A protein has these predicted regions:
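Sec/Tat signal peptide C-region and signal peptidase I cleavage site
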Residues: 20-25
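Early extracytoplasmic/lumenal segment of secretory-pathway proteins
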Residues: 26-93
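Extracytoplasmic ligand-binding site segments that recognize negatively charged/polar headgroups
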Residues: 36-41, 78-80, 84-217
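A ligand-binding cleft/hinge motif common to bilobed small-molecule-binding domains
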Residues: 88-94, 217, 222-240
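A bilobed periplasmic-binding-protein/Venus flytrap-type ligand-binding module shared by bacterial periplasmic
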Residues: 130-137, 174-178, 252-266, 282-285
């Protein structure tokens, strides 16, 4: 009888613990992004209103780390519930079985731009690599398109380029070399690196948004490849910088749920909120990055809308996320070898 009571007590305690854990799981989720102003805006636009409407606490974590995400999934100890990742990684991770499939009864995809939704991820936001330039350094010579980067006589000074092996730099080199936008893929790597060789000594590399802004605003770089939102922020601060949207290169971040996430249902609801017309518009209005939801456009601030990629659709070149998902790792090896030559 005593043993029976002890067993009952142990079982009761175990059930209580499980119930508490289930309650905790339902009441919180871990959101992971890149930090800085982007994650601050995601918190303000998505996490705070989501918590108010659902009573689900959103715990901020980061920065996004692809190796860590993979290790969590493979070990079966997944601590993250929603992760902001680059679009090409989202596709590659899905092919490797690292992500949960989305529930499209919860996440409404009918009004999501089809470029920015897949079976395992929905767009967080999209942005463009644009040609930014320092007006004080270049004077009346206003760069028009990516060919200007390679014309060091007309446009003297350093060129700022994104240093990571990801979509963007190789494409702009090929466009500047005369490749038509609809003939970019598969990338002619020999041709792209040969073109970059012509200005390699004039390149200053940036790895994050704040660094890119400093290079441009200070004039250390006369012109270069920049995230559109960072150039817009400089303009709002009165910096003497201009921008060309010709052949702006469209890239995106996706929101994904790691395979085995402990709070999958709450995470799915978070994705639905973040990708809604209101969620996307609120984030865009804070950052000058574009919404993936087509119904968000009328909700944008009147003075902001002309400064978003959505206003320059006719000049867009959408980077091929699927191509990079398949070939990115091989390209990265060659990229890193070229950098140190």
């Amino acid at each position: 009888m005593l043993l029976s009571k002890r067993v009952t007590a142990v079982l009761s305690a175990s059930l209580l613990t499980l119930a508490c854990q289930a309650t905790q799981a339902a009441d919180s989720l871990n959101f992971v992004s890149w930090g800085g102003t982007t994650q601050d805006a995601q918190k303000e636009a998505w996490a705070v209103p989501f918590s108010k409407s659902t009573n689900i606490k959103v715990v901020q974590d980061g920065p996004t780390d692809y190796g860590k995400l993979k290790a969590m999934v493979e070990s079966g100890n997944v601590q993250w519930d929603v992760v902001d990742v680059e679009a090409d990684f989202a596709l590659r991770a899905a092919s490797e079985g690292l992500l949960e499939p989305l529930d499209f009864n919860t996440v409404k995809k009918d009004r999501i731009d089809p470029r920015f939704v897949s079976d395992h991820g929905v767009g967080s936001f999209f942005f463009s690599f644009v040609l930014g330039y320092n007006e004080g350094k270049l004077g009346a010579n206003k760069p028009v398109d990516w060919t200007s980067l390679f014309d060091t006589k007309t446009y003297p000074g350093k060129r700022a380029l994104y240093k990571w092996p990801s979509p963007g730099v190789l494409e702009l080199a090929l466009l500047a070399d005369g490749v038509a936008p609809d003939e970019l893929y598969p990338l002619d790597l020999d041709r792209a690196f040969k073109k970059l060789d012509t200005i390699k000594k004039d390149i200053v590399w940036w790895g994050g948004g704040a660094q890119s802004q400093q290079l441009l605003a200070s004039g250390e770089a006369s012109l270069g490849q920049f995230w559109n939102g960072r150039v817009y922020a400089l303009q709002q601060d009165g910096a003497p910088v201009g921008v060309s949207w010709k052949q702006n290169l469209v890239m995106a971040d996706f929101l994904v749920i790691p395979k085995g996430a402990k709070n999958k249902d709450a995470a799915m609801k978070f994705l639905a909120n973040a990708s809604s017309p209101e969620g996307q518009a609120d984030f865009a209005n804070l950052t000058a990055y574009a919404p993936v939801n087509l119904d968000s456009v009328p909700k944008l601030k009147a003075d902001l809308a002309p400064n978003l990629p959505t206003a320059y659709a006719q000049d867009q070149v959408t980077l091929d996320f699927a191509y990079w998902a398949k070939n990115g790792q091989a390209i990265a090896a060659r990229w890193n070898e070229w950098l140190v030559k």
